[in-house]
């Protein structure tokens, strides 16, 4: 055997040896979800500390609420990504930009007296990013992006005017995730877009999982099973992109007569969702089923 052939054979054997010593290849997304929260609450009141937030792992609050420092609870600052509420810092920031609020308005939400906002507009995106920056500086470990359904519904009814809005929503959340890689992000619903968003978010709030507040009739009602099944399929698809996606089921009920939401707790456990019940103003928690409740 010539010297050159011997050297080549030796190098080849050495490379194979090194390859055999390597550990297993790590997938970008683990098939085993990481440990998540065991409890959560949503509170939009001003009382601090709020009894509803006592001892929970995740707390979703208005961004003017002081995030606690007990070490256990992770606080999420509320940010409306699909609508602009009057009088907010975001509304004031956009008012000072060229074109003002009208330049980013797609329509109106008459019940909440808010504007359905256009995430494609640079001024709106910048205002949102500035709010996120302020919230992280105040000590929030997460953000809660609300009202995703509003621009999605606008896109469904106005497909030409809303061209590109879905991709703009997705790209905005990608930008936030890239800018704040350790920041927890939870979105409210947005199920039609959830599979695309899943790799960039920590969780989804399933508002109106089983019971909700009828804004027209001004009373609490049960959510039809058929409506829920469709969204459960969207969640299942999203979890193929992010197996650790946390689902927070939120229901509404009358604190004085809360039996309407009792079956919801059982449904949430079956789906392995965390469950919370509140009055429609999100300022008062609603107790769950009493001990021994059988559903009869």
What are these regions (language model features)?
Residues 1-8:
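Bacterial N-terminal signal peptides that target proteins for export
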Residues 8-16:
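Sec-dependent N-terminal signal peptides
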Residues 18-20:
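C-terminal motif of bacterial Sec signal peptides marking the signal peptidase cleavage site
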Residues 22-24:
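Sec-dependent signal peptide cleavage junction
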Residues 26-296:
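Glycan-processing catalytic domains of CAZymes
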């Amino acid at each position: 055997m010539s010297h050159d052939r011997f050297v080549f054979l030796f190098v080849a054997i050495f490379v194979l040896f090194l390859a055999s010593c390597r550990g297993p290849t790590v997938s970008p997304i683990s098939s085993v979800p990481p440990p998540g929260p065991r409890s959560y609450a949503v509170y939009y009141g001003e009382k601090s500390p709020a009894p509803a937030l006592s001892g929970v792992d995740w707390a979703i609050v208005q961004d003017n609420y002081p995030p606690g420092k007990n070490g256990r609870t992770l606080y999420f600052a509320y940010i409306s990504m699909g609508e602009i509420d009057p009088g907010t810092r975001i509304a004031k920031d956009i008012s000072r930009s060229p074109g003002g609020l009208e330049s980013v308005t797609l329509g109106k939400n008459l019940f909440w007296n808010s504007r359905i906002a256009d995430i494609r507009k640079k001024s709106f995106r910048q205002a949102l990013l500035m709010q996120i920056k302020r919230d992280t500086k105040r000590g929030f470990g997460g953000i809660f992006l609300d009202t995703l359904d509003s621009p999605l519904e606008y896109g469904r009814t106005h497909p030409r005017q809303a061209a590109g809005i879905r991709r703009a929503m997705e790209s905005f959340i990608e930008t936030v995730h890239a800018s704040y890689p350790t920041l927890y992000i939870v979105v409210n619903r947005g199920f039609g877009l959830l599979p695309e968003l899943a790799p960039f978010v920590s969780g989804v709030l399933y508002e109106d999982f089983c019971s909700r507040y009828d804004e027209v009739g001004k009373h609490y009602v049960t959510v039809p099973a058929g409506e829920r099944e469709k969204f459960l399929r969207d969640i299942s698809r999203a979890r193929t992109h992010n197996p650790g996606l946390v689902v927070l089921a939120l229901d509404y009920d009358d604190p004085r007569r809360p039996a309407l939401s009792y079956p919801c707790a059982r449904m949430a456990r079956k789906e392995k969702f965390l469950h919370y019940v509140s009055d429609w103003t999100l300022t008062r928690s609603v107790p769950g089923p009493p001990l021994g409740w059988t559903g009869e």
